[in-house]
Curated annotation (Swiss-Prot):
Keyword Glycosyltransferase in annotation: no
Organismal lineage: Bacteria, Bacillati, Bacillota, Bacillota incertae sedis, Caldicellulosiruptorales
Cellular-component GO terms for this entry: cytoplasm
Cross-referenced NCBIfam families: PRK00364.2-2, PRK00364.2-4
Family annotation (Gene3D superfamilies): GroES chaperonin
Subunit record text: Heptamer of 7 subunits arranged in a ring. Interacts with the chaperonin GroEL.
Protein name: Co-chaperonin GroES
Assigned protein family: Belongs to the GroES chaperonin family.
Keywords, alphabetical: Chaperone, Cytoplasm
Gene this protein is translated from: groES
Compartments it resides in: Cytoplasm
UniProt-listed PANTHER family: 10 KDA HEAT SHOCK PROTEIN, CO-CHAPERONIN GROES
One Pfam assignment: Cpn10
InterPro entries for this protein: Chaperonin_GroES (IPR020818), Chaperonin_GroES_sf (IPR037124), Chaprnonin_Cpn10_CS (IPR018369), GroES-like_sf (IPR011032)
Amino acid sequence: MKIRPIGDRILIKFKEREEVTKSGIVLPDTVKEKPQIAEVIEVGPGGIVDGEKVEMVVKKGDKVIVSKYAGTEIKIDGEEYTIIRQDDVLAIIED
């Protein structure tokens, strides 16, 4: 199944959450922090703000840092993804 975001929305997949701390403590789901680094899977065509077209800055394959509580979580074919708006992207990670 392919998801194609609309407007200024972006489909991302978060980096896996840490299951065990560096000291070996296993973390239950209730105390794990939501990761903020994600990979861009798909990008919408852009949106309209104040009557003007907004170009998308991020592109498919980018690694990004996103706001901690941004987006809508979805599950597709057993995989977890999040749909966010471009404004929720704080930075693009460049290697």
